[in-house]
């Protein structure tokens, strides 16, 4: 069964900027899709760097003119990566990535933010290899739009005031994430 972890907060609206998915440069985009590649290196066929270690990712964004997969030049845990960008303005320490920059409002003291987090794994339980890895979150405000992030990243996002590091199981296997922004006027 789907384990639901949900919290809704309605506080003061003026503390939240427009919600949007963010790319590697911190620019607002309508959507992005990320594929964290599985570990490519074996003892018989060693591959150096993030690709060999299972820390490389490729992405698409609504702003890419050619709409082709782009291999990121940085590992997924880098503060400027797509998942890590969220963290550049997050109030606690977790390795940064575009997902993290996108989620910064979740960890701020913004009082007008509604958030819903769902995960088919218990926050501090064992990783299951038999479930569908149903994970995601919704962030929304009355006037600043919303974000829906669907992903398969283990134990993500962390609870506020908890640290996060990309898990070893996440390095071995491929992971996906998709972020969609909505405008409050739509």
Feature names for model-found ranges:
Residues 2-186:
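HKD-type phospholipase D/PLD-like phosphodiesterase module
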